[in-house]
Structure formats: C-alpha cells, structure tokens
C-alpha cells in the first residue's frame, strides 16, 4: 500500500492540542507503515518535513489547490492558474489574427488541466461542452477563429480563472445536500411552465408560465431546436424564477425536477455531447450558478404521468381547451382548485419579466450573453 498524501484537519483550542494530534498522527503512520528489512525507508518523507509540509497552518497547498482553513475557501494554486491564463490568452490572441492554430496535443493537455482547475469552480464544467466535442473529433490542429462557440467558451474560462483568486470558492459551495428549495418544470411546443416550493426554507408556493415566441416556435417546427432543447430552456427559466422567488441562494441547496431524461442528464453533468443549443443553455445555467454562489444543484427525473402539476402551466395557450387561461387570475383560480394547498393557503403567480424571457429566448436561439446577464 502506498499513501501519497496524508492530510490532518484540526480545529484546536491550544498549541498543546496540536502537538498531541501531531504526535498521534505520526505514531499512527509509523505503526501502519513501519520500516522493515524489505523497505528501510521512513514512511514519512524527511524532505517534506524540511520543506515544512508537516507543519500545521491555516493555509495549505494540497493537490494543486490552496485551502484557507479560517475562511473555509479554496482556489487553484497561483502558479497553475497563471500558467493556464497565459496559455488561454495566447490562444485568444492567435485566434484574432486567424492564422495560427492550436496543436491537438496541446489543446488536449490544457483542457485536462482546466477540468482539474474546475474542481474548485464547479460551474466551470458547464463551459466545456464545446471543448469536449473538439476532443472527440481529434483534429490535428484546433482553430478557435473557425468556431465562435469554442472561442467564447475559452474566453469565459479565462474570466472564471481570473476571478477565482479575488473571490475564492467557499467549500460549502462544493457539497450537495437535501434541498432547501424545489422547482418542477415542463415544456411543450406551445410554452413552458413550472412551480417553486420551499422544502427546508420558507418560500411562497409559486407557479409561472410563458408562451414561446413565434421565432422559437418556428425554430422548433423547422427542426433547428428539439423538444429536449425546449425542456433545457425550461429549466433555465425555472432557475431564473427561483432567483427572484427564493431570495439569496448563496450556499443553498436546490433540486430541479424534469420529466425529460436527457435534460436531467445534461444538468447533472453540466455537459452535453450532441446538442449545441443545449450546450449554450447549460453554459448560461452554469454561469448563473456561479454568480449566485449556489451549492451543486440536484437534478431529478419525474415520470411524465406524475408531472401533471406542470402540464397545466406549460399548455395554457390553447392546446388544451379545458386549461385555457387568458389572465393570471384565471390561472390562479384553476391552480388553487386543481392543486389545493393545506391550511387554505393560496398559490402565487409569478409574472415573468421581459428581461428574463429575453435572456432565455436569446440563449435558446444561440445569441451570445455575458457572465453578468
């Protein structure tokens, strides 16, 4: 058995406690890995002890990441981040001239390092779908200026890496847990709708709906976007509604339910292999997760027959005559009678703003956006 790194985390109240834990730790290591006739080397590296790696400190470098034990944050080691930024910036500069390309081996190596770096920035994984597609194709040379989606992904990766030193990731943002809030969504060729409720945190039970624009409907019927793309856009709609309804989502746990299996898989991995449209939507969702400092979301599949609560708001636009609601008051009346809440509580209708609808529609139609949006 070979142990590469051993980490001891202590919350001491005195220096004596640190000495006690240090002695116990080193004794335990020698007991488990004693020097013998076969291997006379000491199990604890003298070289690393001289480098002070064995000293307790509030800040430590472990496996390429800097950990701050007081602030409970982590970030990529400065030298590694600087190297990645230098390479990525050189790629972007070369792409502006439209001449030089990136050797595939170099591209593959840097993307692997980026994937490791995004251990501390989980939302960064949502930017790598265009990179993953290029890795599958394995061209001898990668040209960013010929692939604007890939070029945009590299540019945003630079932004996340650059900001990570000024705003390190809180360790709590890396841990999944039981949801504080739950959102359920469904999308059809007519529109999208969903509900938001609180689980461990208080939240006004909310329902929302939105009819797709003529441009989106035309893109769907012409085959440029798929039903799964609409479902993915629906989850992005749902998230933006939750930002408004649930308040501060920093370090909160959120579960998102959908009856579309591909969408659930994409959100779980923050990546898609096939759909370029959904890759664009995942990128938008990932950036919103980063802006909000939310814990990893929990995407869950719900069977279509059990998702009747969101069938209504996603099909209120004439496809189902019995569900036709011309006003929010009609929707509220229908929802309260069909899905009554306990203690005579009432649902609330969230009116989507043009800002939110324009955001999602733009992303769905492959128009560009920024981190702040």
How does the language model describe each region?
Residues 54-172:
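C-terminal reverse transcriptase regions that engage the nucleic-acid substrate
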Residues 35-61, 65, 295-308, 312, ...:
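Acidic carboxylate-rich catalytic motifs and surrounding loops in phosphoryl-/glycosyl-chemistry enzymes
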Residues 65-110, 313-373:
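Flexible, low-complexity interdomain linkers flanking nucleic-acid-processing modules
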Residues 4, 63-64, 111-112, 131, ...:
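Mobile genetic element proteins and their domesticated derivatives, centered on retroelements
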Residues 3-5, 10, 240-308, 315:
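RNase H catalytic domain
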Residues 1-37, 68-75, 117, 262-278:
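Catalytic palm subdomain of template-directed nucleic-acid polymerases
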Residues 176-190:
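Two-metal-ion RNase H-like nuclease active-site motif
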């Amino acid at each position: 058995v070979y142990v590469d790194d051993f980490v001891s985390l202590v919350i001491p109240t005195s220096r004596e406690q640190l000495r006690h834990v240090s002695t116990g730790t080193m004794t335990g290591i020698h007991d488990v890995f004693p020097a013998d006739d076969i291997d006379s080397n000491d199990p604890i590296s003298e070289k690393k002890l001289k480098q002070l790696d064995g000293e307790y400190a509030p800040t430590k470098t472990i496996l390429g990441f800097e950990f701050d034990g007081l602030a409970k944050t982590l970030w990529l080691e400065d030298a590694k981040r600087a190297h990645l930024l230098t390479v990525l910036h050189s790629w972007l500069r070369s792409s502006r001239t439209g001449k030089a390309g990136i050797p595939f081996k170099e591209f593959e190596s840097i993307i692997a390092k980026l994937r490791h770096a995004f251990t501390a920035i989980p939302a960064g994984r949502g930017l790598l779908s265009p990179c993953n597609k290029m890795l599958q194709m394995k061209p001898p040379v990668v040209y960013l200026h010929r692939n604007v989606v890939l070029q945009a992904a590299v540019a945003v990766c630079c932004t996340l890496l650059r900001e990570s030193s000024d705003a390190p990731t809180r360790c709590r943002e890396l841990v999944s847990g039981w949801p504080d809030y739950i959102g359920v969504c469904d999308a059809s060729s007519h529109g999208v709708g969903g509900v938001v409720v609180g689980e461990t945190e208080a939240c006004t039970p909310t329902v929302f709906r939105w009819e797709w624009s003529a441009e989106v409907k035309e893109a769907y019927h012409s085959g440029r976007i798929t039903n799964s793309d609409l479902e993915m856009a629906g989850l992005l709609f749902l998230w933006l509604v939750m930002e408004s309804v649930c308040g501060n989502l920093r370090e909160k746990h959120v579960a998102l339910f959908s009856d579309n299996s591909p969408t659930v898989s994409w959100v779980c991995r923050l990546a898609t292999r096939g759909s370029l449209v959904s890759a664009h939507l995942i990128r938008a969702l990932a950036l919103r997760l980063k802006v909000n400092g939310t814990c990893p979301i929990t995407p869950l599949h719900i069977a279509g027959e059990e998702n009747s609560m969101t069938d209504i708001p996603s099909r209120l636009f004439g496809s189902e005559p019995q569900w036709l609601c011309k006003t929010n008051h009609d929707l509220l009346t229908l929802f309260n009678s069909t899905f009554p809440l306990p203690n005579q509580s009432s649902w609330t209708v969230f009116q989507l703003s043009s800002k939110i609808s324009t955001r999602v529609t733009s992303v769905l139609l492959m128009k560009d956006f920024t981190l702040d949006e």
